[in-house]
Structure formats: structure tokens, C-alpha cells
């Protein structure tokens, strides 16, 4: 230990032990990450009585804190950013390498709660499952699998919020992200169809905030394909609300103006 004001070795009275910051980070993040996972698991869920009746749990929690694994996540994210031509993937990849850990919370085979609420656009849960079965199977090549029951998406949000609150109570910096979750899913670290990552760090300044977007020369990159859709291609039609031109699997029809109605 050194004194921050002088750079000289710190001295302590007999019986007092200075706290080594480097030794503190790992154990604290590990313990708080486990508490966060517990908070996610006990968070309220739609149709919770199904779980007490023996239905399988659909919420997955995975804690990653190994630097080698964090590097694998970062490298995949850079490859994904190259094929989507989006600098934000590179920005998040740089942060991933510097994290003390990541808690992934996701939905695995999230069956509906049988409320027949209609929020998905179908009259019943059974109708939703039947109508979207092939669509879910076809979405394996996308970043996440879908569509997912709307109420289960709400459940995921509640679980993530409970976990984030637990991190805040213990003063561990946490930020909700999806790109790291995509990387974890594609690398087989998690099995969730849809997931959110909570980036964890114990530093003097939160490393996942106030980050600048890097300048990337995409044409100079030679990164392997992630075999994930969509990807950026020249000439792709920018869909309404899209940030970049990504190639959809189904062509997006161009909107045309309706001719003015003739005066009677």
C-alpha cells in the first residue's frame, strides 16, 4: 500500500491493516453479484403460482468475472461491430475488458403465464405459441430469439431492476447493457433466448459512463464473421427508426404517398 498523497509506503498503527484496493475488488464484486442474482430470482413474476405448482424456472442468472472470458466477450463484440459497421460495439467492447464482472439475467424457454392478456397481439397464450413457433425457430441466427411473451419481458425487466437496486445498495457500479448479453449468448456462456447484462465494476470512477464513441476504419478491419444477422450492406434500405442500414431477411417495402383524394 502507498499513501496517495506522497507515493510513499503507508504505515499503520499496530493492530490496524490497510485495505488493499486490488484485493478488495474481486471478492466484493463476486459477493454482490451473487446477492444481485438472488434479488433477480426472488423478483415478482407473472403467474408465479405456476412455479410453485412445479413448472420449470425460466429465469437464468450467470456471473462472469474471469478476465480471459471477459476478453472473449470483447473480441466477439468487436467482430460484431465490424460487420454491423457500428462503433458502439467497439466502445462497449473496450469497457467489457476493464470490468470486474458481468451478471447476465435472461429468459430461457419463457412460457406464457396463461393470462390470455392479449398484449402480444394474440387472443390467447396458446394462439401466440402456435402462431409464432416457426418464427422463433427461424430467429436462431439473430442476436436474440423471439418473439417472447410480453409479460415475460416485463418479468425480465423487474428482475434486472431488482438486481440493479441491489448493486446500488452496496455501492458497486452497475450498468444495464444488451450487447455484452448478445456476445455471451452467441459464445454459449448463457442459454437465454433474451438477456440483459449488468456490467459490474468497483473503481473510483464508473468505467461504463462518459465514454466517447471511437472512430473506426471498418474497411481496414479483418475480423471473423459472427454468423449473426443483421449485417450492414451497401444499398440496404434504412427501415423506419433504424440507426444504420442493415440488411433485413425480408425486404422492407418503401412507403409511397397516397394520391390526394379527388374533389367530389
Predicted regions span which residues?
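Acidic, surface-exposed loops and disordered segments
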Residues: 2-264
